């Protein structure tokens, strides 16, 4: 029986971690392997790292040279994997990413499991997950255990912890017309879809030993999509992998000048590029919406919304809507005069809530809601933290807001995906 392992490593702009990933393959105690480095048109620093290893004849390199405009057409890592699979001639297929390292005995231990259990078609191992800061220092870690036979492996196993027989690929291709489903709608869970395909033919057998370690950086793919809703929230500062900051408003991402750096410092949401790039780029905003402003020598306080200044008529309205004086930004008289007047922000006890300010959190019947563009949206606590919505919620009842519709909830996208696919997570 053969024992060759084909490893498919996908990479994009992580030179330091990529080097560690490649080194971890070279240091395997099982040396009958081939490595496909499938790079998605990374920067020069990353490609320089790759070229250092191409003298090893077991290593093959493919650069996608994908055009930026085409990045939104498919789930890129799934596309890269599909490009490599037809050329893999190992008895077993294994996967790796540029932020994960194999432990030295990883291949030998999995090949051994197949040898001892001829009925095994797919195996998975325990994984150590390490969260690191911007300096690469460990903040925390936890383990993904491998202590059960999985008939539904989707959303439960990281794809760097799996090895399966190559013979399964023909069965999958015959049944589904392809290997990994690289439809863009699966951009953040392509491995889960592929595991579901594998589970049509075999369970995943466990090896409850830590055989790989994955590193989650502040800008890592996993951290970036964690707790993201299906749609970006108006009034958010966001950034992709290029670190450029945008202000999101009405479905458009507006570049933010350095003038407003004090606003987005420590409150910018990192999001995956495919998620960000679906929104077109607009012009630079003179003044972002959803901020408090006043003139230096004038007591009137305004809330900017829809490009208009809404005067907060008194202290009662200011306090009821949970505004904070520390958030007031002083602007010049000329800048203030360029803003058209919007409806004033008022509040009177025992009345219906009328014309409330947008992007404010409410607590209605013990549930959190975000009021945005005239609609109350249910919102999860994870999403409020993700988007730095730290304002104390405004207490209200459905009777107080009966004139406003209830809109689409802002819930983590993974929750929506799992419900839609009806895939078990326990």
From Swiss-Prot:
<dbReference type="InterPro" id="IPR001173">
    <property type="entry name" value="Glyco_trans_2-like"/>
</dbReference>
<dbReference type="Pfam" id="PF00535">
    <property type="entry name" value="Glycos_transf_2"/>
</dbReference>
<protein>
    <recommendedName>
        <fullName>Protein CgeD</fullName>
    </recommendedName>
</protein>
<dbReference type="InterPro" id="IPR029044">
    <property type="entry name" value="Nucleotide-diphossugar_trans"/>
</dbReference>
<comment type="similarity">
    <text>To B.subtilis spore coat polysaccharide biosynthesis protein SpsA.</text>
</comment>
<comment type="function">
    <text>May be involved in maturation of the outermost layer of the spore.</text>
</comment>
<dbReference type="InterPro" id="IPR050834">
    <property type="entry name" value="Glycosyltransf_2"/>
</dbReference>
């Amino acid at each position: 029986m053969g024992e060759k392992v084909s490893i498919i490593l996908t990479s994009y702009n992580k030179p330091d971690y990529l080097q560690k990933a490649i080194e971890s393959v070279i240091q395997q105690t099982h040396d009958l392997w081939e490595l496909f480095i499938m790079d998605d048109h990374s920067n020069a620093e990353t490609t320089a790292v790759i070229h250092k290893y191409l003298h090893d004849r077991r290593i093959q390199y493919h650069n996608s040279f994908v055009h930026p405009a085409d990045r939104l057409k498919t789930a890129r890592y799934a596309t890269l994997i599909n490009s490599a699979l037809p050329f893999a001639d190992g008895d077993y297929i294994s996967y790796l990413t540029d932020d994960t390292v194999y432990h030295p005995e990883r291949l030998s231990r999995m090949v051994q499991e197949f040898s001892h259990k001829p009925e095994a078609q797919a195996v998975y191992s325990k994984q150590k997950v390490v969260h690191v800061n911007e300096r690469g220092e460990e903040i925390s870690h936890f383990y993904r255990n491998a202590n059960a036979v999985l008939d539904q492996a989707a959303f439960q196993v990281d794809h760097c912890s799996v090895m399966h027989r190559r013979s399964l690929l023909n069965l999958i291709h015959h049944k589904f017309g392809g290997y990994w489903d690289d439809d863009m709608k699966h951009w953040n869970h392509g491995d889960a879809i592929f595991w579901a395909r594998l589970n049509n033919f075999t369970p995943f057998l466990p090896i409850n030993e830590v055989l790989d370690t994955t590193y989650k950086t502040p800008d890592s793919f996993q951290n970036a999509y964690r707790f993201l809703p299906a749609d970006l929230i108006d009034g958010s500062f966001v950034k992709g992998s290029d670190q450029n900051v945008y202000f999101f408003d009405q479905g458009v991402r507006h570049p933010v000048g350095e003038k407003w750096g004090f606003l987005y410092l420590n409150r910018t949401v990192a999001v995956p590029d495919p998620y960000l790039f679906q929104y077109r780029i607009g012009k630079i905003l003179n003044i972002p919406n959803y901020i408090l402003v006043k003139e230096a020598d004038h007591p009137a306080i305004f809330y900017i919304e829809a490009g208009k200044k809404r005067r907060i008529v008194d202290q009662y309205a200011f306090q009821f809507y949970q505004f904070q004086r520390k958030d007031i930004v002083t602007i010049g008289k000329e800048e203030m005069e360029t803003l058209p007047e919007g409806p004033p922000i008022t509040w009177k006890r025992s009345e219906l809530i009328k014309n409330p300010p947008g992007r404010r959190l409410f607590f209605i019947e013990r549930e959190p809601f975000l009021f945005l563009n005239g609609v109350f949206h249910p919102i999860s606590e994870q999403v409020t933290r993700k988007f730095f919505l730290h304002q104390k919620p405004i207490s209200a009842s459905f009777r107080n807001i009966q004139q406003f519709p209830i809109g689409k909830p802002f819930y983590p996208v993974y929750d929506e995906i799992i419900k839609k696919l009806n895939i078990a997570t326990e």
